[in-house]
């Protein structure tokens, strides 16, 4: 087993990693910025090292400082958590080159899955369903383009190869508009990105966001741990997550889950990972793979009984996964609300001192947070201050428990988005289950 781990992160995930290390008897090193001296995990770690000033670029993204911290403390591994350097292939490479274990996949796999084109190619090869498309840029041959569009099926979306941020995209609903739309998107792409290459993809009108949790070890084993539904989003940021996803049968779960597990073996994956899909009309379409632990991992832990962070540590130590696929049984239902220090109406961050905190409790209630009474939420980082997770035998029980838990929570001194969560949980369509990724923004009157 690993002997000493550097926790290269902050906030609730750093505390989550510390708890798993302690349970496994692993010593911990907390690296922190000058703004984070009073973080809960910093107060609890075996050793602490300040790695720089408050801005992330000078601390949590400071690769030489993090590796130096591992060297001076005699650590044998570094856990990147999520965000920051967790999906930075250069960091993973430098960690391993410096003689430490990176708790995550290899740098090559992070690179492969971090590039959209190579990731989709690898997934198609491994039998994971992807969004049907033109398999590369379209030509000027309109007859051929019409043929491709017909094969994909309308509506389609034309995207600029060099595009991003919502620019250089056009939805086409019929063949009549195809030629003109391609020409217009090409012209836009040339003007905006100096690259007029465009490609076609099937346009999904009202998809849900469904993702599959996987674990893979260095002994050729890979397992899937059911799915999560993260469709309740605002500005592409997940707000509420749940597991399992409403309406997904065991048969469907087994099919898509085993494809993801097989893909892990194909690409030589190791550690915890998540395959993200758009799900519409009973079909899954791969969008990307997250090569790290995710914010919403607790809902999977609640329904499977697996400690995902402990498995990450075991795998990094060279041990096989501690269970087999057939041992995994989905039981009950779990929900997670991301509690942010922000104004519930304007969504602007609300840093400051937490004068008083009362966290909820009771059967099936889990509170993952680094915040305590007297703690000051700094303005430099992500606004998430807690994750409230509830579990019940049924989805209805999990929702009711979440409503109770939210009403019990007292966070005095700063504003939080708890009113937004209360609004979502009492929404009739959310209670039925299966709302799509646009639902919350439409409800908030945000659809642009």
Swiss-Prot record:
Residues 120-317 form the ATP-grasp domain. It comes from Haemophilus influenzae (strain ATCC 51907 / DSM 11121 / KW20 / Rd). It holds the Pfam family CPSase_L_D2. PANTHER family: BIOTIN CARBOXYLASE, CHLOROPLASTIC, PYRUVATE CARBOXYLASE SUBUNIT A. Biotin binds at residue 338. The active site is at residue 292. The lineage of its organism: Bacteria, Pseudomonadati, Pseudomonadota, Gammaproteobacteria, Pasteurellales. Its EC number is 6.3.4.14. Mn(2+) 2 binds at residues 288, 290. The gene is accC. This is Biotin carboxylase. Hydrogencarbonate binds at residues 238, 292, 295, 338.
